[in-house]
Amino acid sequence: MAPTNTAAWLTAANSPLAVGPAPYTTPSPTQLVIRNHALGINMVDIVVQQLGPALFSWIKFPHILGSDIAGEVVEVGSSVTRFKPGDRVVAMAAGLTEDNTQGAFQTYSVAGEVVASHLPASISYAQAAVLPLAVGTAACGLFQKNYLALQHPTIPPKPTGETVLIWGGATSVGSAAIQLAVAAGYEVISTSSPKNFDYVRGLGASAVFDYASPTVTADIIAAFAGKKSAGALAIGGFDPAVNVGVVQACVDVVVKSEGRKFVAMAVQFDPAQVPEGVGAKFIFGSDLKDNEVGPAIFEHFLPKALEEGVFKCATMPLVAGEGLEGIQGAFEVSKKGVSAQKVVVTL
């Protein structure tokens, strides 16, 4: 008999999540079924709750949101070779697609083998739940061929002699991006608030600048003097006015630095801000499941990196709820803003 599944359903735009029964789905040949023990909350979940199809036209109600899961494998598809029932895993769910079986906010989620990694016993499920979408978004921007196209991370790193700008180093995406870029052999220059300078340097950034400083762009341009730029990863938030400044700063830095003229955008942007000769593209963090970056990160790099402590769950989990019923309250905590933390719900 199949296990009994339950989900936190989004039944309409701008409506609270409603917990209720959900079908249990057996995996396809390349999928796992995971019994979720911790779920990460991302701002995109909150925005989809507010806007629904107005943001992503393919969203249909009722819908199961969520991208970050950590838990235990209960069933594997016929072609899966890396995992077996009982394995502890962290995986990226597909809560922004039409397929409700792959949303995170349920007891049992289906996830692709290509976006799942073994989780060492030394890392708790709550710690691991901060990773999946952050790692996926960072990796898509840094490594996909139609973005910055950096070389892939290795243990140990293979130095490239190039420097990349990661704007927003204390965010969950920034924390993942710094570690991935350093492991790929790049020097990282980043930004944060002054209270997080030590945190960002601890991730591997060689220099960190105050994003609120009136001279931050000029200071970063000066820091790139004599260096070969590998481009920039721009990480913003949900304040349009702030995002305009983030995009402009990153564009100005790559324009005035020697090297690659490209900004990978983890922020909504106006193409009019990007001058001729500079490339820019918005990042969809799930795209790596369909190309070589997915296995490069989730299979070949992340499991060993987590085991050896090369890659850390640096963003601290802020457990703001327990059970599927706690997700809506966790949304409210996340809306207030957190710094160098990510809101998590345990199951």
PLM segments and residue spans:
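Terminal helix/beta-alpha structural elements that buttress the NAD(P)+-binding lobe
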Residues: 2-28, 35-76, 81-347
